[in-house]
Every structure is written in structure tokens, then in C-alpha cells.
């Protein structure tokens, strides 16, 4: 790893905390002993005196071949692109026992993440008919929190959105502490909920769907008597239109106005996904003389959490950029915990359908701290009873297999681990 450079952390100006309610909400004063979560406050809250850890997260979706999102729903094992359900335990757990009674060795990715210093996992897709308690329980055992995702499907006007009021209760129950989605409260591993991913890139839903879905979610929580304190984010890309002063300000201006989610502001966090260097993020955005995070917080009074942050290996300076991003983020979060809650490095493993090996030249697929190989660690044989997301007899789940592959470390592995564990 290259020698680390100290980053100057800007101090807040007089307008740094325009909304004192938001600041108080994310600055609690009491910690549950040994639990790392706050008593009576949102799970993201970090107190002024007993400061909970800055979230050092990782984006996690390390499917092996032949996974491809374009045809994942044609299979039982990859249906819904859900990495966290029970049948995926051969990837993230130490072992997996099928309903057939057979036990298979696991790749144990969650343990690897723990050893890297990760304390937050960001997921992308979640099928509410699946069971996820094993994954969530394992995260609790390892001291790792989870950003539980609402897949794009549920926000798309031509897919799940019109039926959202019937679908949302099932999603909420699938985030519960019940073994078969039958709990009465959110699982303790869940630190927050993220809805969708980058609507500006997929062009498949808008800020209007984000707003309406969130309102209906909160109303469903009340009806179901679930807690109404989990923070909610809406991940967006880092593109900037000609009319914007800074990336995604137009999106948030609408999302947070009176007719949308202004009344839920204290429940929200902003979740942009930059690839920019630390200088832009924390010191000088758009030649303004101040960093993006500081100015965005001052503008909206809502804390930020980067749900993706990284640089692909195709860029010649990617290692220096990643190192600066991580060090700058942790330093700024320590200095301004009310503004900046954490980061999720993008990502644990390359996208296997774009980068089946380290030698790939695809920029979108080569962000991983690990690369895939052709070495199969184990072949897992499933039986139909291992799957809960299908409506038999209309779906064939016979002879389904998963072949966890050996992962190899990339240069960013040492950078992330070195910084996260310091």
C-alpha cells in the first residue's frame, strides 16, 4: 500500500447545522452496553460523548458463475438476485445444510468481511418470499450491521409499484426477526432500509415513486405495529445535470419538499454513490472552496451515507483514489458525525457476468476487492424444498446447483483492510 497522506478535514461553518432537530436525532447520548446501537434513537445515531463506530461498509453481491441478472429469474437458485437468503449460505456462511440432510462447506464470506474490518453490509436485492434469518443472525454474531434493500422491482411503475400496498407488508415481515418472516419487529442486524438503486441510470422509476413508496411503507409499519425508527435512504448515482450546482441536488430538492417527504426528513439519510476523490468530496467540490458532503448537509439538513464509493481497476490511479476516499471519509465522519454516517466500499467481489477473472477489462465490473476464478470450491446440490420463493407446480426447482468459486484478493483488498482495521 502506498504511504498514506493526511487529509485536511474542513471545519463546519456557521450554517453547518441548519436543522437542529435532525442534528439532535443523529446525536444521541446513550449506548446499550456492548451492543453498539443507541437506546431510543435510530440505529445510525452516534452520540457526542460515547461515539459509536463510523460505518465502514461493503457492497455485497458476490454471485459465482453462471449468475447474470438478465436471466437470473429463469433459475430457482438466483431468482430475485437475492444473495442473503438461506439457500445462498454456501457463499457467505461456513457451511450449509440442505433439506435433503446433506451438509456442504461454505466460502464463509461474512467471516472474510469481519476480518477486513467491515461493520456494515449494503445489499441490492431481496425477495420477500425467501427466508433471511440465518444471514441476519450471522451478521449479528460477527458485529456487522445490514442495509436491507427494497429491489428496483417494487418501485417500477410497470412492475411492483402499482401493487405496493399489498407488497410492502410482506417486505416488512421479511425484514423481521422471525424464522419464517413471522416476526413482530425488525431484525436487530438491520441498521437501515434502502429503496431502489440509481433511478437516473436505469430510467425505470422517479423521485415520485420513491416518495409514494416511502410514505406507504411508513403507514404500513404503523398498521403492523413495527418500529418506525429505522433510517431510510434512496441510493442515487453521482451524475450532475447542467442545472444542478452539485450532483443530485435536484433529486433531493423534490424528495424533501413539503409535498413529498419533508415531513419524514428526520427519518431519512441521503445516499449518493460517488467515484470522486476525497478532495472533491471533502475539500473543494466544483471549485467552490468547500467539500460536497459539507455543502450538501448544509443545504438539506439530512446526514449522508455513501451507499457506494470506489474506483474501478481500469483507471491508472485507482489505488490512490480508493485510499484517499476511505481515509478522507473516516476522518470527516469522525470530525462531523452529525453530517456523515458512513461509507460502503464498492465492492466485495467483481461482477462475475462482466469479470469472470482478474484479467477482465470491463470498467463497471472491476471494482471488487476480490476477483473470481474458475476454481470451484464445492458443488451444492439442492432439493425443491430448499426454495420458498416459487409457486409450485409452475416452477421447476429440480436439480438446482450452486458452485461457489474461489476468490482471489485484488490490490484494493489490502487498502480496504488496512484502513478499516486501523
Q: Which residue ranges define each predicted feature?
A:
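Active-site groove signature of glycoside hydrolases
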Residues: 171-208, 233-238
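Aromatic-rich peripheral "rim/lid" segments of glycoside hydrolase catalytic domains that contact
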Residues: 346-422
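Aromatic-lined substrate-binding rim segments of carbohydrate-active enzymes
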Residues: 105-157, 211-230
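Short, acidic/polar
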Residues: 87-113, 167-175, 245-257, 329
Amino acid at each position: 500500500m502506498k504511504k498514506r497522506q493526511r487529509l485536511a478535514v474542513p471545519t463546519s461553518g456557521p450554517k453547518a447545522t441548519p436543522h437542529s432537530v435532525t442534528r439532535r436525532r443523529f446525536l444521541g447520548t446513550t449506548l446499550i452496553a456492548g451492543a453498539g446501537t443507541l437506546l431510543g434513537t435510530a440505529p445510525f445515531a452516534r452520540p457526542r460523548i460515547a461515539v459509536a463506530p463510523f460505518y465502514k461498509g461493503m457492497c455485497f453481491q458476490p454471485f459465482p458463475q453462471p449468475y447474470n441478472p438478465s436471466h437470473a429469474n429463469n433459475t430457482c437458485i438466483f431468482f430475485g438476485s437475492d444473495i442473503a437468503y438461506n439457500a445462498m449460505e454456501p457463499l457467505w456462511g461456513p457451511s450449509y445444510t440442505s433439506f435433503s440432510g446433506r451438509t456442504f462447506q461454505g466460502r464463509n464470506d461474512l467471516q472474510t468481511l469481519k476480518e477486513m474490518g467491515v461493520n456494515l453490509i449494503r445489499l441490492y436485492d431481496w425477495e420477500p418470499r425467501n427466508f433471511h434469518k440465518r444471514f441476519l443472525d450471522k451478521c449479528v454474531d460477527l458485529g456487522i450491521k445490514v442495509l436491507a434493500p427494497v429491489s428496483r422491482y417494487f418501485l417500477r411503475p410497470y412492475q411492483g409499484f402499482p401493487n405496493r400496498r399489498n407488497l410492502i407488508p410482506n417486505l416488512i415481515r421479511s425484514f423481521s426477526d422471525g424464522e419464517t418472516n413471522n416476526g413482530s419487529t425488525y431484525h436487530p442486524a438491520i441498521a437501515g432500509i434502502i429503496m431502489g438503486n440509481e433511478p437516473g441510470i436505469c430510467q425505470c422509476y422517479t423521485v415520485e415513486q420513491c416518495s409514494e413508496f416511502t410514505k406507504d411503507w411508513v403507514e404500513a409499519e404503523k398498521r403492523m405495529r413495527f418500529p418506525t425508527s429505522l433510517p431510510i435512504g434512496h441510493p442515487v448515482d453521482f451524475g450532475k445535470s447542467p442545472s444542478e450546482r452539485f450532483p443530485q441536488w435536484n433529486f433531493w430538492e423534490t424528495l424533501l419538499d413539503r409535498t413529498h417527504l419533508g415531513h419524514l426528513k428526520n427519518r431519512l439519510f441521503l445516499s449518493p454513490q460517488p467515484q470522486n476523490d476525497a478532495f472533491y468530496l471533502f475539500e473543494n467540490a466544483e471549485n467552490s472552496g468547500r467539500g460536497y458532503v459539507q455543502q450538501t448537509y448544509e443545504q438539506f439538513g439530512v446526514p449522508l451515507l455513501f451507499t457506494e464509493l470506489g474506483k474501478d481497476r481500469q483507471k491508472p490511479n485507482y489505488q490512490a483514489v480508493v485510499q484517499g476516499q476511505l481515509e478522507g471519509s473516516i476522518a470527516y465522519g469522525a470530525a462531523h458525525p452529525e453530517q456523515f454516517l458512513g461509507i460502503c466500499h464498492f465492492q466485495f467481489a467483481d461482477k462475475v457476468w462482466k469479470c469472470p477473472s482478474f484479467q477482465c477489462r470491463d470498467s463497471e465490473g472491476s471494482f471488487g476487492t476480490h476477483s473470481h476464478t474458475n476454481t470451484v470450491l464445492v458443488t451444492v446440490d439442492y432439493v425443491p424444498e430448499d426454495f420458498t420463493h416459487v409457486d409450485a407446480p409452475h416452477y421447476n426447482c429440480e436439480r438446482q446447483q450452486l458452485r461457489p468459486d474461489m476468490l482471489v484478493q485484488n490490490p484494493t483488498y489490502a487498502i480496504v483492510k488496512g484502513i478499516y482495521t486501523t
